Amino acid sequence: MSAAFAAVGEAPPRPDAVRATIGLPLAECVRLLLPAAAESARSRIVAAYREAFFDMRRFETVDEPLFPGVAALLDALEARGVVLGIATGKIERALNLTLERHGLLGRFATRQTADKAPAKPDPAMLNRAMAEVGATPVRTVMIGDSVYDILMGKNAGVRTVGVVWGQNNADELAAAGADFLARDAAALSAWILGDGG
């Protein structure tokens, strides 16, 4: 984010300010980080960030590893017939690149992205995901690492799980209303599959 701001002559935002916006679409992050700037300046920052991101992808210098235990969890969920979906603040192109890199593109029945729906915590992405797969709120769980994920789930009327190994800590996720806090993939698996959670 700092490089994108610098590329258009703006002072870089504080790291804690950037962290507080993670989970939101990029344009919304920039608007929150630079509220007094003209829309044209914010648009240039968004473009600079995306260019840098896709350059890092092209040259394979971005590191987005799966968290420990997540691949096995996805296998276990699929084996039980759980329908998987994604609702993310990323744009579709960025999400697909990430999923392709990990061989996960075909594992999700629905993929909702920030370039096709209102920003979290608006429930539109989650509502569209449920509609696409024929799910109901009572049979849906929103799992996320940001308070915006939890708030979106609450706004859609679904149960929510905060994973504490990502962007927000346990206290922040609990304050947002998470129904369960998972400290690791094993705890998440146990809660979802009913194997002791």
What are these regions (language model features)?
Residues 33-71, 80:
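Metal-dependent phosphoesterase signature
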Residues 180-184:
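Short acidic-hydrophobic, aromatic-tinged amphipathic segments that line or gate anion-handling sites
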Residues 18, 42-46, 95:
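Short amphipathic alpha-helix in the helical subdomain of ABC transporter nucleotide-binding domains
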Residues 1, 70-100:
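Substrate-recognition element of Asp-dependent hydrolases with the DxDx(T/V) motif
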Residues 1-20, 34:
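Active-site neighborhood of HAD-like aspartate-dependent phosphohydrolases
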Residues 4-5, 25-40, 98, 129-130:
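Helix-loop "lid/cap" segments that line or gate small-molecule binding pockets
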